Amino acid sequence: MNFPLIRQQPWYPGQMGVPGSDVSRGLRTQPNGIVLFVDGNHPNATTTADGTDPNNPLSTITAAMAKLVAFHALSEVQAEGSTIVIAPGTYTDSIAIDRTSYPPDCSIIGCGNSKFDVVWVPAAGDALSIDQSGWLIDGIHFQPAADGAGVKLTWNAGAGAEDTIIQNCFFDGRWGTGLYGVEFEGAPANCTIQDCRFAEFDTAQPCITITATPTASPYQTHILRNTFQEAVEYITIEAGGFNASIIAGNHFVQATGDLGATTTYINLGTGSLGYNQVVGNYFDGDYSNTGGYTAETNGNDNWVGNFAADVAEAEVGDNGITVAEPAA
């Protein structure tokens, strides 16, 4: 495997002990950190490989994470900024990134000829649970298990998965088999979900959800330029709500009914603050609370400037532009 496409490349040059690392192939994105390569299909791949050479990669994501934890134990500062590069293939790992064992500001990058080449499908539980700050997840095709999320972001008592970026990923509900796409548990702040695709999640199995708010609600979340289609519930809440967040440039498509009709496009819940900006999106279906669009209950959200197909509503102009929050 030659790792034909590495998003935000490159990281390989300049590692100690790697033959040919003095060859100029571009600039690193971080002054610190190591790069670990995972390729379950490579003939040289093992769980005990060094992993810093793409020709001698690790065979599982779990093995790469164990290497990163060991490096972090040796040098907390130098471990920051490390990257896990995953080659095309199917991976069944279930990973929990905690604040004690793992460094902040690291990346998990899927490489290949499209964003769908790296398939992460755990047998059970969350594919990836993050309780550390500043991680970047890019280019992964998540197929969540029946009892877990593709990516779960946690935060409680002032610490957790703040500043996470999830981009260029496909959250595939597998026609109702997967539980959640992205799950917020608690209130990680300043998280970004952008340029992703969500599809095929069933009733009570939403694409993006908040399941618990022990201290607060997700704050300054950015949900940008994503596509939501063929699911019953898109962005919803089981606890709390979104605060001071931006939902912009997304495309919400009414399901064709293979799983069921879309019942929830956006429900921002009952958080303590509100002030969410929901602008510049395309809204399919019935632009109303009954149709599945619900602003935060404090009444201070801004929903002006979306395009909605439902021009019959008083909150939608004749040109299809929303002029107010959705109403009953």
Region spans (language model):
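Right-handed parallel beta-helix/beta-solenoid
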Residues: 2-63, 307-311, 327-328
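Glycine-rich repeat segments that build the extracellular carbohydrate-interaction surface of secreted
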Residues: 36-41, 59-92, 106-112
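Right-handed parallel beta-helix/beta-spiral solenoid domain characteristic of secreted/periplasmic
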Residues: 94, 103-152, 173-175, 201-202
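Parallel beta-helix/beta-solenoid
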Residues: 79, 100-104, 123, 132-133, ...
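Short, T/G/N/S-enriched strand-turn elements that build extracellular solenoid repeat scaffolds
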Residues: 62-77, 91-101, 126-130, 152-156, ...
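Extracellular beta-strand solenoids
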Residues: 18, 38, 86, 93, ...
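Solenoidal tandem-repeat scaffolds enriched in leucines and small polar residues
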Residues: 170-231, 235-238, 242, 247, ...
